[in-house]
Amino acid sequence: MAKDILFDVRAREAILRGVNILADAVKVTLGPKGRNVVIEKSFGSPTITKDGVTVAKEIELENKFENMGAQMVKEVASKTSDVAGDGTTTATVLAQAIFREGAKLVAAGHNPMDIKRGIDKAVGAIVAELKKLAKPTKDKKEIAQVGTISANGDETIGTIIADAMEKVGKEGVITVEEAKGLETTLDVVEGMQFDRGYLSPYFVTDPERMEAALNDALILINEKKISSMKDLLPILEQVARAGKPLLIIAEDIEGEALATLVVNKIRGVLNVCAVKAPGFGDRRKAMLEDIATLTGGRMIAEDLGIKLDTITLQDLGRAKRITVDKDNTTIVDGAGGQQEIEARVKQIRAQIEETSSDYDREKLQERLAKLVGGVAVINVGAATETEMKEKKARVEDALNATRAAVEEGVVPGGGVAYIRCLKALDGLQLSGGEKFGVDIIRRAVEEPLRQIVGNGGLEGSVVVNKVKESSGPFGFNAATGTYEDLLAAGVIDPAKVSRTALQNAASVSSLMLTTEAMVAERPKEEKDLPAGGGMGGMGGMGGMGGMGM
């Protein structure tokens, strides 16, 4: 298959055209006065969004060379979204500015490798300055402010996220679900919850709510199936003598064993409830060990040399309260030792650091939350499906931004933090053409502020100069159109988001600047189909004989 190849200036011009098309579509969404973008869907209603990465992901260009440029900037937005969860539009604006300025210098004959080194030095200096500028998030109010800004000024979302974080802690899991009604609400589940319900409705103790409630209960955690009553009998007799309720968690409980438990429950001999173990395969084993650690019991597993018919009450876990409905089991206030729980938490944290799979990381994070905090669910309500999709995306963005703020602190928002970091570029030791790379960054970091102001219908240059002349957190609040102390006004960005956006934008733009050739497949030429031939003549329809009337 023959390929098309572009060299030198023509290659960079094609990249720039692609970068501009994508960035111009994305950057209209930046800031409190940013506009919406409507995206056609192959089925259902179109999506209306103000989320940069959602817009970027939808863009594919017809020209293959321009499309390569667009895809590289899309990578900037996606990577920023993956790492920091927000800041995708800022990253796109920065990438466009860095590449546009750099392409002019390379076209004028400057060495792109010198420029790249200058860009790297400048970004390193600004990132170090951002870290100095960042202040830790102290209270719920600041977390709510970060959430509000990331949710495009929606205070209810900011407040709900701050409430959720306060209730489940930094390590807690916060999930976003679609609500049935119009209201956006917060549900918090304390303790350890997993998605398995009772194996028989006969275990229910509260018929009105259809749930089994066990107070001050014992917990039997078994890795394998239980089908024979013979194995269970010894421990059941001990539990009956102790007069305490019992929860049995096993891979499955069936046949004779389940029937006997149900009969004993109905007769009032034993207050018992049986549920299947959560998860599958190795993850199931790990989750059962988590439950054992949390409740101070042992997991009954044959590979550990523990048999079901030899265990005593000492091997069972304990919890103050257990609630089981048809879908979920919640264990509150387990009797596990604090040291053992902390050791388990440390182990899970180490696994989170090591894993490269996003799915595994998410599941490990959930296990961690169940051990240390709890789980909060934000139910997003809206009037229509289109509004629901848009609002849910905003809540997820805001949630990611608040997590980033808790992690690395906050800096003044509205593009001001970058301008306050410019002083870090003055003392850099530079050689040769590196100065041009630093100048590119010096100009590029003004771009987010210019764009925020431009989207608000004002002149960017005037505002940039006024902000440069001042110091500290003083800047332009685009939501109100006033100059003020942005930290006091609650216009703040997570330092992690600002840092990641600049690093990713500079990384990809530098690569594009040092591109000397581009190779793409030639578009296939559609051959004109020959005109369709007429239908062959239909043979004569033999004489039909005289049709007498």
Curated annotation (Swiss-Prot):
A single GO molecular function term of this UniProt record: ATP binding
Keywords for this protein: ATP-binding, Chaperone, Cytoplasm, Isomerase, Nucleotide-binding
Enzyme class, first EC level, given as a word: isomerase
Cellular location(s): Cytoplasm
Gene3D superfamilies: GroEL, GroEL-like equatorial domain, TCP-1-like chaperonin intermediate domain
Catalysed reactions listed for this entry: ATP + H2O + a folded polypeptide = ADP + phosphate + an unfolded polypeptide
Chief location bin: cytoplasm
GO cellular component labels: cytoplasm
Source superkingdom: Bacteria
InterPro entries: Chaperonin_Cpn60_CS, Cpn60/GroEL, Cpn60/GroEL/TCP-1, GroEL-like_apical_dom_sf, GROEL-like_equatorial_sf, TCP-1-like_intermed_sf
GO biological process, one term: protein refolding
PROSITE patterns: CHAPERONINS_CPN60 (PS00296)
E.C. designation(s): 5.6.1.7
Quaternary assembly: Forms a cylinder of 14 subunits composed of two heptameric rings stacked back-to-back. Interacts with the co-chaperonin GroES.
NCBIfam families on file: GroEL, PRK00013.1, PRK12849.1, PRK12850.1, PRK12851.1
Function: Together with its co-chaperonin GroES, plays an essential role in assisting protein folding. The GroEL-GroES system forms a nano-cage that allows encapsulation of the non-native substrate proteins and provides a physical environment optimized to promote and accelerate protein folding.
Name recorded for this polypeptide: Chaperonin GroEL 2
Taxonomic lineage of the native organism: Bacteria, Pseudomonadati, Myxococcota, Myxococcia, Myxococcales
Gene that this sequence comes from: groEL2
